[in-house]
């Protein structure tokens, strides 16, 4: 490759994005960052409606999982309508199709789940029988394990729809990703940020990923200043847990890595949807590279396998049918992402 191409600022760039309010915010966030790097570059946003945005009457894990949020964007990359696609990282399948690359992972927003309620300040304050809304199997399993006296019901729709359902009294509380609420200036709706013990975040939650065609080395170089090494190591470790376990979107699976005292600490969970069986494993690595972070993810996945995680994965994948079984490792974040992009 001609390195001179990399040093020449791009003249135009097109960002492919879902058309949801949060997705467009994220695309605009990247557009502004690129404009600061390359003031003379004309950066446009191509808004697109994905199948995942259109299906609102079913849990997405039953009709195709995470891939429903990215296929149309990848088609735009492939045919040249767009140069890059901006994703909430937990929307991105663990294995990308041939010819595509996740070139850039940006600095993470708050990865925690958030309790949104008009009447209660914590999950512990909710009375027996209170209805909590979520379409995330991960969140549902954690709620059923920690608060079996609560009633968990599905919640779909975009962010405004979900909040309106809460406000009209359909739910006593709902659980959403904190990052999406904060990015849209709705942080005041958060009554509590959930401790990982109550709701371990999904792999990649709160992080933005930029996908490009694998043959665009020039574009990868232009995007390199937006890459955040610490976030990349954390989410690569998390995604490796999901990838190694090879579960389907029907499997409540979470992985969350944090940096403390120069070391990366990773925890993973696999559960049954009813919360009756929850397996947990954790490990740490000092100042890991991305390669060591991936190995850390494999270590945690292996520890979960030794506890019987694959029994849960196989049983749930078989019960959900071959379509879900083919989806590859994934927490059920795709269902949440229809609302918040997170």
UniProtKB/Swiss-Prot annotation:
Question: What Enzyme Commission number(s) does the record list for this chain?
Answer: 2.5.1.61
The organism sits in which domain of life? Bacteria
Q: Where is this region: Disordered?
A: 323-342
List the cofactors: dipyrromethane
Name the reaction it catalyses. Answer: 4 porphobilinogen + H2O = hydroxymethylbilane + 4 NH4(+)
Give all S-(dipyrrolylmethanemethyl)cysteine modified positions: 249
UniProt signal peptide: none
Mind telling me which SUPFAM superfamilies this protein's record contains? Periplasmic binding protein-like II, Porphobilinogen deaminase (hydroxymethylbilane synthase), C-terminal domain
Q: Which GO terms describe its cellular component?
A: cytoplasm
Q: Which UniProt keywords apply?
A: Porphyrin biosynthesis, Transferase
Q: What class of enzyme is it?
A: transferase
What is an annotated GO biological process for this record, any one? protoporphyrinogen IX biosynthetic process
Molecular function per GO: hydroxymethylbilane synthase activity
* Pathway it works in: Porphyrin-containing compound metabolism; protoporphyrin-IX biosynthesis; coproporphyrinogen-III from 5-aminolevulinate: step 2/4
Does the keyword section mention Transmembrane helix?
Answer: no
Annotated PROSITE patterns: PORPHOBILINOGEN_DEAM (PS00533)
Report the co-factor binding details. Answer: Binds 1 dipyrromethane group covalently.
**Miscellaneous notes for this chain?**
The porphobilinogen subunits are added to the dipyrromethane group.
The family note in this entry says: Belongs to the HMBS family.
Which HAMAP family does the protein's record reference?
A: Porphobil_deam
As for what it does, the entry says: Tetrapolymerization of the monopyrrole PBG into the hydroxymethylbilane pre-uroporphyrinogen in several discrete steps.
Subunit annotation:
Monomer.
| Name of the featured protein | Porphobilinogen deaminase
Gene designation: hemC
